[in-house]
Amino acid sequence: MTINNRKSHLKDLDPGLMKDWEIAEKAEEFLKPSKMLAEELGLTEDEIIPHGKYVAKVDFAGVLTRLKDRPNGKYIDVTAITPTPLGEGKSTTTMGLVQGLGNLGKKVTGAIRQPSSGPTFNIKGSAAGGGRSQCLPLSPFTLGLTGDIDAVTNSHNLAMVALQARIQHEANNTDEFLSSRSLKRLDIDPARVELKWAIDFCAQSLREIIMGIGGKTDGYQMHSGFGISVSSEVMAILSVFTGLADLRERMSKIIVAYRQNGEPVTTADLEVDGAMTALLLRAVNPNLLQTIEGQPVFVHAGPFANIAIGQSSIVADRLALKLADYHVTESGFGADIGFEKFWNIKCRLSGLKPDCAVIVATVRALKMHGGGPKVTPGAPLDPAYTTPNAALVEKGCQNMLAHIQTVKTAGINPVVCINHFAADTAQEIDIIRRTAEQAGARVAVSYHWANGGEGAAELAEAVIDACNEPNDFHFLYPEDMPLRERIYTIARKVYGADGVSYTQTALEKLARLENTGNTQFMPSCMVKTHLSLSHDPALKGRPGGFTLPIRDILTYMGAGLVVPVAGDIKLMPGTSSDPNFRRIDIDTHTGKVKGLF
């Protein structure tokens, strides 16, 4: 099918009348085979690993070696204002911008994270985008893709298997017996096990469990629990590793527990690190998919931004930047958490420098931040969000200004994308445009949900202009800044906090880290709610006068991250009373999946 024929067909797909999965099903009749997509990118046949006709993995190491002397393309991050619980269309905007740049004749790629089954079957959906700006094929993308998250889950849980077995065998056997198995007693403290089990669902009943209750042959009775797979340190490692040797070294450093004398127990101590790495071998290569309009999209790694690093992989971005003139990557949630981690973690570890950041804003979210009624997933929107209310928008723009300031603090050029909804009025949009421009940002109104790449023309042109303008990219803090000062700097300059407080648990862990000095050069990966600039999801707008409470500090030695946990946020989300799985099914005649979004 020619490009013009494909465009003509896509124009018949009306998001106002069709569900996302219905649009995807029709558009998938005209997908480019992965082989064609790879050829257009400049990949050789031996650099792609097909997974069916429309999904492939790409040998990143081979491509990077072949293209090591090729200059990088322009590097664009898509972030957002603080969202409502419904999301503001950041993934949709990412796909729309990729399509918009492609529509202008640019060689462009995108990169997004693999969706977790947790939100897919719960509330938020698959993060494939929506309307006429989606990542396809939808069902494989949404339902496990090539098994990367399963590999992460299995690798993580193998460490737990090794740890639990070691505790049991040391409890049941003498030193002489252990020695006969070439084992040295590790003397693990069951009360100081750092690791939990992993599962890729939202399962609140598994947050805290008692295990090993059957007897001596059934394990060691102890308190444990589960986190969602995408919060695993193994997933963070998949996001930040730069090559197989780096991956192997990182997998050996994961701290799983502490000994009775306070020394850490690592995956290397359990002799499980090699096997854990082996489980990841097929997951290390990025997955190649495409937009509805046929531009290439790399999908790799899937950590959340509120409870993890919130970025697709470094290797996917490095790969794409060698293949394209413009590469659009996405960081999770708002600029306070997703972009901050892109800025101070991903770019620091990768050595890559962005040219531009797109901040997605909606009239709906700004009304919420201006004092609008509560937005609840599954419940009808209050009329305040579907009828004109310029005053709410004007007041809510304070939240947008905070995110613009964060991007400008990084020294790069912000572009505010007003993601257009049908109920938006010209007056409301003018308020957002005027406020953002006065703050030094470019502004574009984008209709990509309704019109695909053509609807993102203004956005694409604004991004090109921003990328062509010089910038002064720099990090928020030097890598040797003391940990307490680093946490304070993020809290003050990004969140707007007056100060930071610590629980006794956090203070004790902080003191141990400061005494060892092991974390001096490790970036801070903050864990906090995505629903507010603060730690409290109820505080909307641009809150001030608050103290950021750090209740715990986790140490991810393998990923090379210190993880301060702010407020009451959990590493295992819960499933709602009206989850998406109620609406997902198959067509028994065609074998296709219905109800995904």
From Swiss-Prot:
Binding site for ATP: T84, P85, L86, G87, E88, G89, K90, S91
SUPFAM superfamilies, per database record: P-loop containing nucleoside triphosphate hydrolases
Keyword ATP-binding recorded: yes
Enzyme class: ligase
UniProt keyword terms in alphabetical order: ATP-binding, Ligase, Nucleotide-binding, One-carbon metabolism
Xref: InterPro entries: Formate_THF_ligase, Formate_THF_ligase_CS, P-loop_NTPase
Pathway: One-carbon metabolism; tetrahydrofolate interconversion
Domain of life according to the entry: Bacteria
EC annotation from Swiss-Prot or TrEMBL: 6.3.4.3
Catalytic activity reported: (6S)-5,6,7,8-tetrahydrofolate + formate + ATP = (6R)-10-formyltetrahydrofolate + ADP + phosphate
CDD domains (alphabetical): FTHFS
Keyword Nucleotide-binding: yes
Family listed: Belongs to the formate--tetrahydrofolate ligase family.
Protein name: Formate--tetrahydrofolate ligase
Organism: Dehalococcoides mccartyi (strain ATCC BAA-2266 / KCTC 15142 / 195) (Dehalococcoides ethenogenes (strain 195))
Gene for this chain: fhs1
